Amino acid sequence: MSNDVDDESKIETKSYEAKDIVYKSKVFAFKDGEYRKAEILMIQKRTRGVVYYVHYNDYNKRLDEWITIDNIDLSKGIEYPPPEKPKKAHGKGKSSKRPKAVDRRRSITAPSKTEPSTPSTEKPEPSTPSGESDHGSNAGNESLPLLEEDHKPESLSKEQEVERLRFSGSMVQNPHEIARIRNINKICIGDHEIEPWYFSPYPKEFSEVDIVYICSFCFCYYGSERQFQRHREKCTLQHPPGNEIYRDDYISFFEIDGRKQRTWCRNICLLSKLFLDHKMLYYDVDPFLFYCMCRRDEYGCHLVGYFSKEKESSENYNLACILTLPQYQRHGYGKLLIQFSYELTKREHKHGSPEKPLSDLGLISYRAYWAEQIINLVLGMRTETTIDELANKTSMTTNDVLHTLQALNMLKYYKGQFIICISDGIEQQYERLKNKKRRRINGDLLADWQPPVFHPSQLRFGW
């Protein structure tokens, strides 16, 4: 018995050191007053020591951050990633057998499923965007190359690529591992210093500076304050480079053609990617229009937010990407952008819907807008109505109307048919919102606006 006790006393729990932490391992890092499991996405050696870029489990990516070993509790252990399975290679002279007739028929009739993309460790050749640049470009925006660390994307057939583009237009989900790491520390735009939320494919050298200075009019980017000040002395732009199509006593809207203002539109896409996680930037902005909302002062028109849309959308999308700059969020500008997009859709005599997927904040804003529009219409009607009639009056798609009614639990089955029913709670909540003073888009100020018409050559990607 005593021998067993001696043997147990010799058993020691494994102790870990900082050198045991590897890429993609999981550790317990201090966050919000307690230690939480976090995944190691990058390890860097700096002058002050080794730092780790971590993603906390069940947390949004915008909360990813750099931490030191002092924030990691090694006594709780390290969870290592599973080893990668070796790929099976066919030997020389071996030909794959043809599948049986039954298997061939099954493969034809079965619905196809797209496998999730896996990042490759190979480095692609440097790629540059095609098309001519705008006049007046500078060293800060001559080209927008992908970062060297960018991984080679999966090879897709023409049909798969078209389907992927059609699913999300100008932007798609970014499958690359490098895109999981926020590469810009801080940006300075106007009087505001902002910490970005996500990765954006700015040139590599900008990830090595403390602050990236961005012009609030042309959105050119610089790595030093001196370069930025020299640019401001020469920059003559005081508003977005397009036509002002809407103006009231509060805001203005400018319409910009991506084909005519490539550099400006690319710069605004790079900036917006810092605050959008679910989408990846395409450098060819030719097939898109940009509608920019600005506030005016004695210095010019300052961008508050914008949305882009395809010049021609086969799915009737009236919006490709939407963003309110962080310094202007929670002031009601998002709803103004959404309302303006639907006002344009009404002038086009169409039904519209935003491209999917929406960001988390975008989805919240759209659901609130849809709910307000539908409840307002239903409460104001004295006769029976249908989903198609609601869609026609709001320029929303029938799917969006149906989704909103279901989300609000307004569809009830009564005497063999579905009816629209508003509960007392929803009506009271709507009355409270109605009493709040909020700015709205005046559709009458768009009476002179005509939907732009484009030649087929102006609608294709030019890369």
From Swiss-Prot:
Keyword Nucleus (UniProt): yes
Source taxonomy: Eukaryota, Fungi, Dikarya, Ascomycota, Taphrinomycotina
Basic residues composition bias: residue spans: 87-99
Assigned keywords, A-Z: Acetylation, Activator, Chromatin regulator, Chromosome, DNA damage, DNA repair, Metal-binding, Nucleus, Transcription, Transcription regulation, Transferase, Zinc, Zinc-finger
Positions annotated as active site in the UniProt record: E355
Name of the coding gene: mst1
Catalytic activity: L-lysyl-[histone] + acetyl-CoA = N(6)-acetyl-L-lysyl-[histone] + CoA + H(+); L-lysyl-[protein] + acetyl-CoA = N(6)-acetyl-L-lysyl-[protein] + CoA + H(+); 2-hydroxyisobutanoyl-CoA + L-lysyl-[protein] = N(6)-(2-hydroxyisobutanoyl)-L-lysyl-[protein] + CoA + H(+); (2E)-butenoyl-CoA + L-lysyl-[protein] = N(6)-(2E)-butenoyl-L-lysyl-[protein] + CoA + H(+)
Posttranslational modification: Autoacetylation at Lys-279 is required for proper function.
Function, in words: Catalytic component of the NuA4 histone acetyltransferase (HAT) complex which is involved in epigenetic transcriptional activation of selected genes principally by acetylation of nucleosomal histones H4, H3, H2B, H2A and H2A variant H2A.Z. Acetylates histone H4 to form H4K5ac, H4K8ac, H4K12ac and H4K16ac, histone H3 to form H3K14ac, and histone H2A to form H2AK4ac and H2AK7ac. The NuA4 complex is involved in the DNA damage response and is required for chromosome segregation. The NuA4 complex plays a direct role in repair of DNA double-strand breaks (DSBs) through homologous recombination.
Chain positions found as N6-acetyllysine: K279
Binding site for acetyl-CoA: A320, C321, I322, L323, T324, Q329, R330, H331, G332, Y333, G334, K335, S359
MF-aspect GO terms: chromatin binding; histone acetyltransferase activity; histone H3K4 acetyltransferase activity; histone H4 acetyltransferase activity; peptide 2-hydroxyisobutyryltransferase activity; peptide butyryltransferase activity; peptide crotonyltransferase activity; transcription coregulator activity
Name the record gives this protein: Histone acetyltransferase mst1
EC identifiers of the protein: 2.3.1.48, 2.3.1.-
Domain MYST-type HAT per the UniProt entry, residue ranges: 179-451
